[in-house]
Curated annotation (Swiss-Prot):
GO terms for biological process: intracellular iron ion homeostasis. Protects DNA from oxidative damage by sequestering intracellular Fe(2+) ion and storing it in the form of Fe(3+) oxyhydroxide mineral, which can be released after reduction. It efficiently inhibits hydroxyl radical production by the Fenton reaction. Does not bind DNA. Its EC number is 1.16.-.-. Fe cation binds at H40, D67, E71. Homododecamer. The 12 subunits form a hollow sphere into which the mineral iron core of up to 500 Fe(3+) can be deposited. Its main location: cytoplasm. This is DNA protection during starvation protein. It is found in: Cytoplasm. GO terms for cellular component: cytoplasm.
């Protein structure tokens, strides 16, 4: 993919590697934001309002992290790939079921996907650092903190005292 000139002094091979990591992560973060809204709109059952509002908070966080990730791609001279077509072909998440309604079913589906993205982002921290880009690693660290907290909140809704 063509890159644009920038005065950013990271080596070009580091930029290329990190741009790939960023765009792959961007696709899955956007996908996770979309499925979060899918659940938000369609869930039914006890605790509706609490979960409905919680998912709005998560969506806002995901949108903010997606924006930061996309902007980092461009800062490094790349092109942020956030179109529906790019997200659909690049996301690592499996398709979200559109035939579920019970809150618990949505929570289970979201827990699986939040866990996947949280793990992917943790790997992106290490991969960005190994490529020599601590700034991108820091961006992923911030996203990781929020994803882990969101995952904890989701899991707390379905876990029972043992």
């Amino acid at each position: 993919m063509k890159t644009h000139k920038t005065k950013n002094d990271l080596p070009s091979n580091a930029k290329s590697t990190v741009i790939g990591i960023l765009n792959e992560s961007l696709a899955s973060v956007i996908d996770l934001a979309l499925v979060t809204k899918q659940a938000h709109w369609n869930l039914k059952g006890p605790q509706f309002i609490a979960v409905h509002e919680l998912l709005d908070t998560f969506r806002t966080q995901l949108d903010n992290h997606g924006d930061t990730i996309a902007e980092r791609v461009v800062q490094l001279g790349g092109t942020a790939l956030g179109s529906l077509q790019a997200v659909s072909s690049t996301t690592k998440l499996k398709a979200y079921p559109t035939d579920i309604y019970k809150i618990h079913d949505h929570l289970d589906a979201l827990i699986e996907r939040y866990g996947e993205v949280a793990n992917m982002i943790r790997k992106a921290i290490d991969d960005s650092d190994e490529a020599g880009d601590p700034t991108t690693a820091d961006i992923f660290t911030a996203a990781s903190r929020d994803l882990d907290k969101s995952l904890w909140f989701l899991e707390a809704h379905v876990q029972e005292k043992s």
